[in-house]
Each structure stands twice: as structure tokens, then as C-alpha cells.
Amino acid sequence: MTSAQNESQALGDLAAGQLANATKTVPQLSTITPRWLLHLLNWVPVEAGVYRVNRVVNPERVAVKAEAGAGTEAPLPETFVDYETSPREYTLRTISTLLDIHTRVSDLYSSPHDQITQQLRLTIETIKERQECELVNSPEFGLLAQVTPEQTIRTFAGAPTPDDLDALITKVWKMPSFFLTHPQGIAAFGREATYRGVPPVVVSLFGAQFITWRGIPLIPSDKVPVQDGETKFILVRTGEERQGVVGLFQPGLVGEQAPGLSVRFTGINQAAIATYLVTLYTSLAVLTDDALAVLDNVAVDQFHEYK
């Protein structure tokens, strides 16, 4: 019987492919997000891992006087500005892991992509995702944990309407920076605004498109929780000069790869496995209560029938 190879008129794809090199991508990690919150926060370096927020006590008692007119000789008020005696101190928190890489793997399989570089890249991306999650949800320093009851409001009818966002703006009216919510929350607001005939304006930031309300961008983050068909809208004012919300990091780390992030080689064990310590130091401070407000109980599962 004649073999299949003898019947072929030319070299086949399977055999030819043994001499070809495929173009290979770096590993793709589906959990990576843009992490817009990390980009939009102002980051402040701290000393010794501690950031103390000094606030004024009883600001309404600071007395000044405006003269009623020329020729008045009423005595001027006397005043002083008092400070808190036990101000809040924010301590940097650690997000870390030990990355293990077999030396045989890094020696033999690092072309065209270096194995150590890719393992570190994916580990660092995962740590930064956890960082954004902590900045939103940490019970100690997260945005949701630091909002005061006076700065928390509920929706009028469940779904996020323009009226709801207007009410939220009244809580952070001193130069608000951005809304932060889950992508489902942005979609829900877009539906409500469009249904009412006021579709949101779109702006371009960092090469991406965002819808806005009253000129304030709505920033998506999957770290904002969605539970039982409800999420939250967070309105933030950022920056130290504006008495807003700031991110905190430790500068000058050994093995620093990015602000607050270090990678250190810790050694090779008897199994020829190399270990790297990847550490991120981070926290978040709210300088004044009116720098942050939350719209609660935002329904994301309401839809409209357009006719």
C-alpha cells in the first residue's frame, strides 16, 4: 500500500510547521483592569509609614468682624484657631507575597520572553488590583469606611437619576473631582439620564472615554461592590491643597520598582527555587469629611422600554 507521504505532491503543513517559529504573546491576565482610581488620586510620600491629619476644632468659633461702614469704632473680636489634641494617624498597610521561580525554568525557557520578568509583572499587577480594592473597601482606611453618616444619602427611587447625582454633588460641592462606581452603576445612570432626555456628555481622559454629569466624570471600578442588584456611587475631592482625599506611599524603598512598591531577591533554596519578596505599602487619607460622599442603595437592574 502506498503511504500518505508518498502520495503527497508537496511538503505538508504539519511537517513544515516543525521548522517554523510561532509569534508568542506575553501571558494575558484577565483580572487586570485600568485601575483609574490609582491614576486619579494625588499620592503623598510619608515618613516612617505614618501620616497624621491635623484638623481644626470648632471652626465656627474663629471670630472675625466686617466693619459696617466708615467711622465705626467698635472693638475688634479676639480669637484663635484650636487643633485636635488627638489627631488621626494613618499607618501604611502592606500588601505582599513571595514569588517562587525554579531556576531551571528561568534558565531554559526565557526566550523570547524572560520568565522572571513575566512572573514579576503578573504578580505586581495582581498586587495593584488588590491595592485598589483595599482603597475602596478596607474597613480601616477604605473610601466606603471613611464616609460619615452626614455625607451618605440614598437614591430617591432606586435607580441612579440625575437628581440623585445632583444631591450627591451638594455634599461635595467644593471642587469635586470624580464619581467612582461599578460599571453596572454607570450603565444604570446612562439609562436613566437617556430616558429623561438628558444623555450624559462624553469626555476623553487618559485616552479613554468617560460619561460625565455636571462636568464631573463617572469613573468605573469593579472594586465598588454590587450586592443584591445594588451598588454605590462615591463622589471624591482629591488633593492636599483642596483638603481632599490623598493616597499614601513610602518613598525610597530598597528594590523600589514603583512608588511604594519594592521587589527583593531573598535567595535560592535547596530545591533550586529562587524566591522574590514583592511588597507594596499603601493607605488612603480623607483630610476633611466633606471631601467624600456616598450615594447608597443604587439599583442597577432597572430597565426601560423605549417606544
UniProtKB/Swiss-Prot annotation:
Its main location: other. It is a peripheral membrane protein. It holds the Pfam family SrpI-like. It is found in: Encapsulin nanocompartment; Cytoplasm, Cytosol; Cell membrane. Belongs to the encapsulin family. Family 2A subfamily. Dominant antigen for this bacteria, could possibly be used in vaccine formulation and/or for diagnosis. Protein expressed in M.smegmatis stimulates a gamma interferon-secreting T-cell proliferative response. NCBIfam families: encap_f2a. Homooligomeric. The encapsulin nanocompartment is formed by 60 subunits; monomers form pentamers which assemble to form shells. There are 12 charged pores where the pentamers meet as well as 3-fold axis channels and dimer channels. This is Type 2A encapsulin shell protein. The gene is enc.
